[in-house]
Amino acid sequence: MLPSKRPSDAAAGDENGRGGDARGPGSGRRRARAAAGAVTAAPQEIDEDLHSRQLAVYGRETMRRLFASDVLVSGLNGLGAEIAKNLALAGVKSVTIHDVKTVKMWDLSGNFFLSEDDIGKNRAAACVAKLQELNNAVLISALTEELTTEHLSKFQAVVFTDIDLDKAYEFDDYCHNHQPPISFIKSEVCGLFGSVFCDFGPKFTVLDVDGEDPHTGIIASISNDNPALISCVDDERLEFQDGDLVVFSEVHGMTELNDGKPRKVKNARPFSFSIEEDTSNFGIYVKGGIVTQVKEPKVLCFKALRDAMTDPGEVLLSDFSKFERPPVLHLAFQALDKFKKDHGRCPAAGCEEDAHSFLKIAAAINEASADRKLDTIDEKLFRQFASGSRAVLNPMAAMFGGIVGQEVVKACSGKFHPLNQFFYFDSVESLPTYPLEPQDLKPSNNRYDAQVSVFGSKLQKKMEEANTFVVGSGALGCEFLKNLALMGVSCSSKGKLTITDDDIIEKSNLSRQFLFRDWNIGQAKSTVAATAASAINPSLHIDALQNRACPDTENVFHDTFWEGLDVVINALDNVNARMYMDMRCLYFQKPLLESGTLGAKCNIQMVIPHLTENYGASRDPPEKQAPMCTVHSFPHNIDHCLTWARSEFEGLLEKTPNEVNSFLSNPAQYAAAMRKAGDAQARELLERVSECLNKDRCSTFDDCISWARLKFEDYFSNRVKQLTFTFPEDAATSMGAPFWSAPKRFPRALQFSAADQSHLNFIMSASILRAESFGVAIPEWAKDTSKLADVVNKIAVPTFEPKQGVNIVTDEKASNLSSTSVDDVAVIEDLLAKLQEYAKMLLPGFQMKPIQFEKDDDTNFHMDLISGLANMRARNYSIPEVDKLKAKFIAGRIIPAIATSTAMATGLVCLELYKVIAGEHPVEDYRNTFANLALPLFSMAEPVPPKVMKHKETSWTVWDRWSVQGNLTLAELLQWFADKGLTAYSISCGTSLLYNNMFARHKDRLTKKVVDIAREVAKVDVPEYRRHLDIGVACEDEDENDVDIPLVSVYFR
């Protein structure tokens, strides 16, 4: 099952940030340290602008643990570079990179920090300065001497990517027995094969096994039974599972359950469950109650490496079509270590002698493996392993860099469940379908030698000549550009990589979009990313555009552009953009490589012409929206309160000022539009404009404070008093049931107090933003709560009396809360007349300033007001309040995101890219993947083939388009279908009907050219660059059965 298509990475939109120290030229970057010494730093405050998307995944406590963690990464091949990059972006306290080897041309295939100028330098020393650029808040140092156990004691976690087994045993023994234990990770990438081993010590506590919020339920009833049956409201399915622990709160009647004691769930069902508790003698349940899952820490006992090698236990599977693969790869990696020990090198690519020697070693180890002995050794697989074992391929490094980077985060924080303990992966399906000759695998002393040693020079040439389109240059886009540059995609004069993104760089982008720096803020994402990718590989032939890929830009991304493409890679952050790109790839029959992330989760989907279904073939169910009446009158969770708060913010500060300006800009036109509408919504708009220009008009900052204070009274006191007057606590429905039954919560009016800091904070943010919208000067004392209190306490607040007959919407299906009145037209006329008078009292040229919600600026008071609105409303309804950061996540609709899942997703996509560019791969070679690094879980599956439709001997899928050549008349087109045994009874172009055999007058069109009818009827203007007209045709066969045929293109030019 693929994850939701909604969440995704943001390539062309709202992205993560980085901040802290300025890192522009002259910002005083730290110099790389030549050796690892003790690193000390004062406790850091979390830069919430920088880490907002990461905070949404990890939370503050995990981030604080990361900020206190020192990590060693040993082995700066491509994998080591990826791991170090992800840790620097995550924001650990320090990263020490270690290597004793020097840079060779071979390394440039996998390590994006290196260039040809670095050849001959120490690998760690060559990387340290560029690694430091990623995050100045992380202390980066290089260690270039031989590593000993004494070096390890200062680290919380150590990672090795280039170490022999004997040395790994020595270091792991030291880390395993150290007090406290040092988390040890060993990972290797050998061609298209990879491994990870984790040892976090004899006892390691996982504080949060999955990172999900505790599941909750709203109780509808509880039985007095043994065991007790709890039924919940049927608004949402329960997520509890048997064995979960839950606690109860707010239960009326059966108050014994409110003791905070965790109780075990049994017989979990969609809307009910039982608990291991005898409630026979408890009080009778009356109403209310919330049940909440208790997440308990989990203690894991890791084995040391030398013990785990002989008894690896159950190994996590990534691909269920390779159920027997883990023990095979466990043997292969052991054989490789022995081969390197015997020969001092890896097996040579395509060398039969080395492959034979490798097989002999593997057979000997297997014979000595006792009860773990394999029945047979897959010689073909072992030869493939040996041949590519020296190569650290960039896609594999990116994928494993994401996995290992996440394991380090787990080791340092206890957040998420670690690997237990081995993980193996291979992608041999990425190899070309044709045989690879030894001559084709030989190095030629260029930066692609490692990749050539696996795939051969023929595929390398095809990759360099590929015409590639990357849509979006955010987090996914940056990773893709790095990967493509290292792989050599579009890196010849015959190839071209086009990247487009209409977004600019913001501070909140930088913590995952690693090609950007502080000094790039405000610049176009695509051009900065393209420049950075060209620095990684100067041969990259890239064109950066700032156009959104959408119907409005089809003159830019025209037919000729699309027809020349070899592959399209999506790096988008919203479903609508994905659907559009899917439609275009279907139309032009181009492969689409799709991916997305949501926190620690990621998914990739391959859309291959004629082999797989398209992206749009499977749609997620629409997100459940809370009914309008729930949000506005009956909230029962903080999400409802925040939805209401954002709606009020936009109404008060953006929509109403825009309405005011529309009226003032052209009163006559505005009045005509309101009269034409003549409904309750028009009346309400005019009422708000009228209030802004008269009763609520602000000329001084004191006016703004007064407005804010009266708004507080209206929102959190008067409205609640009216609601509870209309529906008192003992109110009943028309069926006689209690009106205030779950999930409704009975509200209480708030009494304003200047001694309550949250009340004053609301007044402060509301008055400052009101002043901004009216262009009123904001005094320096506006942020002084004591002076603010003095002003507020002098404001006279009218006494509120609830009214009879007020209509409050309770219908959950209602989509509009406006109440229609027979007097609407008369009221509109009266309001328009008053507005004309109010306008005369304004200064000439007066306009309000609409304020558009911006969540990522903590100095603009937007989130202060929204969180204030939401929390005061939550207080009305006894709903737990949230801090401003949590409010920002929910109200700002922030997509949780981390660098590790992004890196992994792009690595997986690029492993599929090898198959796409090579061509001739069957559908069973491709993989769609869903992964959750938090669990961890990897689920790979073959893509679903497209649905095949048939008529007689003709078959087609969604990928097909019927082409009709020639500038045909309508009669000739109808005959073209008749020749296929089909009757075309209706022909349309866009939304216009060109022909229907039921309409007699349409017979007059039979002699006209189809394109001329389209120009006349549909007002189609076919651009010069397009040679054809697309039409939709409804057909039936001889038996009058409808036949769903593909899109038809008439090539008239």
Curated annotation (Swiss-Prot):
One GO cellular-component annotation of the UniProt record comes to: cytoplasm
Stretches for region 2 approximate repeats: 59-608
Catalytic center at which residues? 629
List the pathway annotation: Protein modification; protein ubiquitination
A Gene Ontology molecular function term for this protein is: ATP binding
Sorted keywords for this record are: ATP-binding, Ligase, Nucleotide-binding, Repeat, Ubl conjugation pathway
Q: Which reaction is recorded as catalysed by this protein?
A: ATP + ubiquitin + [E1 ubiquitin-activating enzyme]-L-cysteine = AMP + diphosphate + S-ubiquitinyl-[E1 ubiquitin-activating enzyme]-L-cysteine
The record ties this protein, via SMART domains, to:
UBA_e1_C
Segments for region (Disordered): 1-40
Subunit info here reads: Monomer.
Q: Which NCBIfam families match?
A: Ube1
Other facts: There are two active sites within the E1 molecule, allowing it to accommodate two ubiquitin moieties at a time, with a new ubiquitin forming an adenylate intermediate as the previous one is transferred to the thiol site.
Explain the purpose of this protein. Activates ubiquitin by first adenylating its C-terminal glycine residue with ATP, and thereafter linking this residue to the side chain of a cysteine residue in E1, yielding a ubiquitin-E1 thioester and free AMP.
Instruction: Tell me which PANTHER family the record gives.
Output: SUMO-ACTIVATING ENZYME SUBUNIT 1, UBIQUITIN-ACTIVATING ENZYME E1
Protein name, as recorded: Ubiquitin-activating enzyme E1 3
Its gene is UBA3
